[in-house]
Structures are given as structure tokens and as C-alpha cells.
From Swiss-Prot:
It comes from the Bacteria. Residues 1-84 form the YcgL domain. This is YcgL domain-containing protein VFMJ11_1829. InterPro entries: YcgL-like_sf (IPR038068), YcgL_dom (IPR027354). HAMAP family: UPF0745 (MF_01866). PROSITE patterns: YCGL. It comes from Aliivibrio fischeri (strain MJ11).
Length: 93
């Protein structure tokens, strides 16, 4: 299965995977409004391939069922919580 990957102009780290190049018909208009003007990144064959940030099987299933897959960036790390956990761990030792 080939798909086209586009990056968002409004949300850094967001990518949209669609089956056919420049065919955004399956993507809800509200999502397209939040995504901004899509910028083509690449066309890729998903068969037998690994993707850096997402499970390729989830992408293929979403494209087959919904016509698209939206990849969002991971949530930012809460540095305060990390500090508290590290501090508590040091105090226990």
C-alpha cells in the first residue's frame, strides 16, 4: 500500500497520511482547517516498512477504514513531574 504523507503548517509535528496524492476528500473539513495547508513530505510504500514514530499497521488500518491517518506529536515532557520523581527516588536511596 502506497500513501502520501503531508506535514501541517499549523501544528508542528503533525502529519497526515492519505492513500492518494492530493486527495483530501476523506479528511473531515474541520480537521483540514486545524491542520492548515498540507505540505507534501513524501510518497511511501507501507508494505514491509517501519515508520519512525508510529506503528505502520495502525496507519494502514486507519487509511483503509477512514481514508486517512493523523499522526500527532508526542505530548511534551512535564519537567516538573520528572524532577519530583527523580528527587523522590534519590531521597529513598
Amino acid at each position: 500500500m502506497f500513501c502520501s504523507i503531508y506535514k501541517s503548517t499549523k501544528k508542528q509535528g503533525a502529519y497526515l497520511y492519505i492513500e492518494k496524492k492530493d486527495d483530501f476528500a476523506p479528511v473531515p473539513q474541520e480537521l483540514m482547517s486545524m491542520f492548515g495547508t498540507p505540505t507534501m513530505v513524501m510518497v511511501v510504500n507501507l508494505e514491509g516498512r517501519k515508520l519512525a514514530s508510529v506503528d505502520v499497521e495502525k496507519v494502514k488500518t486507519a487509511i483503509k477504514e477512514n481514508g486517512f491517518f493523523l499522526q500527532l506529536p508526542p505530548p511534551p515532557e512535564n519537567l516538573l513531574e520528572k524532577y519530583k520523581k527523580d528527587k523522590a527516588a534519590r531521597e529513598e536511596n
